[in-house]
Amino acid sequence: MANIKSQKKRVLTNEKSRLANKAFKSEIKTAIKKALNAKSNDEANKTELVNHAVSLVDKGLKKGIFKDNKAAREKSRLMSA
């Protein structure tokens, strides 16, 4: 553990951020799996799931959870499915 007061605060802040990012990544992974596994005969539902997953990926990019190329790759995979 750090001895400097500000560093002790950063350790706590980093842990909170790590847990929040982990939860958000899990939510995105679930949305992507649902979109990729959606039945092609229900086109309206599949489109809705893909749009939701793309939206979450964009939010992850905006928050700095994903890098540019990963977000682009995930969106490309979703759109082509």
Curated annotation (Swiss-Prot):
InterPro entries: Ribosomal_bS20, Ribosomal_bS20_sf. Coiled coil: none annotated. Keywords: Ribonucleoprotein, Ribosomal protein, RNA-binding, rRNA-binding. One of its GO terms (cellular component) is small ribosomal subunit. One of its GO terms (molecular function) is small ribosomal subunit rRNA binding. One of its GO terms (biological process) is translation. The keyword Manganese does not apply. It holds the Pfam family Ribosomal_S20p. Belongs to the bacterial ribosomal protein bS20 family. Binds directly to 16S ribosomal RNA. HAMAP family: Ribosomal_bS20 (MF_00500). This is Small ribosomal subunit protein bS20. It comes from Mycoplasma capricolum subsp. capricolum (strain California kid / ATCC 27343 / NCTC 10154).
